[in-house]
Amino acid sequence: MFENQLEIQRIQKADELRNLGVNPYPHFLKKDMNIKEFREKFAYIAENETKKADEEIVISGRIKLKRVAGRSTFANIEDESGNVQIYYSKDSIGEENYLKFKKNIEVGDIILVKGYAFLTGTGEFSIHVSDLILASKAISILPEKFHGLADKELRYRQRYLDMIMDPSVRVDFEKRSLIVRTIRRFFEDRGFLEVETPMMHQIAGGANAKPFITHHNALDIDRYLKIAPELYLKRLVVGGMNSVFEMNRCFRNEGMDLTHNPEFTSIEFYWAWHNYFEAMDLTEELFNELLKTLNLGEILDYGNLKIDFSKKFQRIKYLDALVLIGEISPEIIKDKDEILKKLKSDGFEANEKLDLGHLQAELFDNYVESKLINPTFITDFPVSISPLSRRSDKDPEIAERFELYIAGKELANAFNELNDPLDQYERFKAQIEAKKAGDDEAHEMDEDYVRALSYAMPPTVGWGLGVDRLVMILLNKASIRDVILFPAMKPIKNLDDKE
């Protein structure tokens, strides 16, 4: 594996250290504080131009730069909180140790140093080292500092190296963690109970998507990795959990692009005795909380877009959006043949087997979605593309449903839940027919879920949001791979060849 000549040399140096009685991978090492805390504690030295501190402390870091000047060495070390310059010499750590480490400690190594804060002759805040311990010897060579990792694919494959070379990457994922904590706290503060539902399902349900299939050896049956937790969460509402949510991983065996990864994080909540209008209000509250927590202000940059969060989110009905935003004639959107004609004339694929609702969805995807820049709720979807949604009392062909769009991306989907078991059963049967007609993502029949509904579920609104896409918007990232620590990648035979 380690065939690079420079790596071989580093392995030899590790062996040389062992021969000198130095373990290149010691354990039970402790530090007093991180670099940020060290800088804060001794900031008075730089502020008052004091030459040095009286107190010695122990800190650690990875060597990012090293410069030897005769009997002394300057280096820059970095940890999770920041970086600082260190200085050591033959006089400060002893000639034997100095000569030992001068040759065998290099850029990339992690070291533990003991010393005091001081200002160099040029006024640079530094640590005057009195003792140095090698904490972990690096065998692989870091990329050259000023070029870093130019290959994006390598950054995703070797996220650890990406974070070493670019501390802002680590900061982004710390912000992602803050976003997740804020979401969780937001719902807990409003009385929602967090639960965990199965990751392996007997029936791939809760969303229209292609599942990953695995096999349970003990039961000798195929299982599907979770595409959505919806049907299990609604079973809990039937059982009396009236405000429930889950934030977890879901899996969909579909294509990968800038906004899709086969393994992703979503949050879903189910809220009995509330409706989709109240869910829209709650969604706006959540975004306001996130913007406040991240100190982002009301106008967000996203690529070359400006997203305005200063106003209430726009609300527009699905069919109205086709006319007003998609600029499609009202006569076309209600006629299946006219929709097919328009799609084909504009160069889009059109499946003649699709019903009117699914063809309207083709219009929406091609003519409307990308134009929804500022936060917009699209409401009242066709029932045929909403198999789990409650029908509108005013129009049985319309579902009481909304989706939230920002920057041309769908972020959230919600609806008043269908709680009529007979209607749900018929919808499942219609989905089976859709699958026969070529819809690979049509919902399967789930008789146990219908049975659960037959015990009566109170009026409930359900809501789901893609956490990864949300993080993309909040952190101004163009690719979902930039907000997932280890995104899905096509395997390569030899990582060294890629490097």
From Swiss-Prot:
Mg(2+) 1 binds at E403, E410. Keywords: Aminoacyl-tRNA synthetase, ATP-binding, Cytoplasm, Ligase, Magnesium, Metal-binding, Nucleotide-binding, Protein biosynthesis. Belongs to the class-II aminoacyl-tRNA synthetase family. Its cofactor is Mg(2+). GO terms for biological process: lysyl-tRNA aminoacylation. Binds 3 Mg(2+) ions per subunit. GO terms for molecular function: ATP binding; lysine-tRNA ligase activity; magnesium ion binding; tRNA binding. Its EC number is 6.1.1.6. Mg(2+) 2 binds at E410. InterPro entries: Aa-tRNA-synt_II, aa-tRNA-synth_II, aa-tRNA-synth_II/BPL/LPL, Lys-tRNA-ligase_II, Lys-tRNA-ligase_II_N, Lys-tRNA-synth_II_C, NA-bd_OB-fold, NA-bd_OB_tRNA. Coiled coil: none annotated. The keyword Cytoplasm applies. It is found in: Cytoplasm. It catalyses: tRNA(Lys) + L-lysine + ATP = L-lysyl-tRNA(Lys) + AMP + diphosphate. It comes from Campylobacter hominis (strain ATCC BAA-381 / DSM 21671 / CCUG 45161 / LMG 19568 / NCTC 13146 / CH001A). GO terms for cellular component: cytosol. This is Lysine--tRNA ligase. Its main location: cytoplasm. NCBIfam families: lysS_bact (TIGR00499), PRK00484.1 (NF001756). It is an enzyme of class 6 (ligase). Homodimer. It comes from the Bacteria. PANTHER family: LYSINE--TRNA LIGASE, CHLOROPLASTIC_MITOCHONDRIAL, LYSYL-TRNA SYNTHETASE.
